[in-house]
Design a protein with these regions (language model features):
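Solvent-exposed interhelical
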Residues: 51, 103-137, 173-176
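Acidic (Asp/Glu-rich) catalytic motifs at the cytosolic membrane interface
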Residues: 25-63, 165-188
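Transmembrane alpha-helical segments that form the membrane-embedded catalytic/substrate-channel core
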Residues: 24-34, 95-112, 159-169
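Short, small-residue-biased leader/transition segments that mark boundaries at the very start
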Residues: 1-6
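Hydrophobic core of alpha-helical transmembrane segments in multi-pass integral membrane proteins
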Residues: 133-164
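Alpha-helical transmembrane segments and their lipid-water interface positions
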Residues: 34, 43, 69-71, 105-109, ...
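Helix-coil boundary and interhelical linker segments in multi-pass alpha-helical membrane proteins
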Residues: 7-21, 69, 73-96, 142-154
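Membrane-helix interface segments
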Residues: 14-17, 51, 65, 89-91, ...
Length: 189
């Protein structure tokens, strides 16, 4: 999807514009689901003092300063990262980033409780069986391995990031919400 927009549009548009189009298409395809999670998490954890207040802020449909800044910083980092590599590398890097970041997000469900709308443990979260984890693991890791040593370094960085997020989410609210998973996905991508 979005990686193909960059690959194909760079023939008649400047690389910068092609990357921006690719980012916009990616947001459009996902309905900004993960970006919304990042913004809500940034607002909640940035402005909230206790678990109840954090979750209340995260549920608020308006975006605050923390949320807006987090989106700007993450989009800028994505843009600069893609801009720093050759156009030929972008499709694989893009696919690998999407794949590993989604695996990283659901990986938070292993050590943490999923908190429902009330902030209590929720049984409504889809339970993944061993086959689901195997498919998620292979599809999340394989594209990154195709990047060689740089892909391996990226996986280590994402693992460290998500260990930190896991500790932070557990300490601040006692688990994860869907917004936390979206934040993890965006920060890992």
């Amino acid at each position: 999807g979005s990686e193909m927009c960059i690959r194909d549009s760079h023939y008649f548009l400047p690389k910068d514009i092609s990357i921006l189009i690719g980012l916009a298409v990616g947001v459009w395809i996902t309905g900004a689901l993960h970006e919304d999670g990042l913004a809500d998490s940034a607002d909640g954890f940035g402005a909230g003092w206790n678990p109840e207040q954090i979750r209340k802020i995260m549920k608020d449909s308006s975006i605050g300063v923390y949320g807006m800044l987090s989106l700007l910083f993450v989009m800028f980092i994505k843009f600069e990262t893609l801009h720093s590599i050759s156009v030929e590398q972008i499709p694989l890097v893009w696919i690998a980033g999407h794949a590993i970041s989604r695996l990283a997000a659901i990986g938070l469900l292993i050590p943490l409780d999923y908190l429902g709308g009330s902030g209590n443990k929720s049984s409504s979260m889809v339970q993944l069986n061993h086959q689901d984890w195997l498919v998620a693991g292979i599809s999340g890791i394989l594209p990154v391995l195709l990047l060689g040593f740089q892909g391996f370094l990226a996986m280590i960085a994402i693992l460290i990031l998500n260990l930190g997020l896991s500790h932070y989410f557990k300490k601040r609210i006692g688990g994860v919400t869907g917004d936390c998973l979206g934040a993890s996905q965006q920060l890992s991508e």
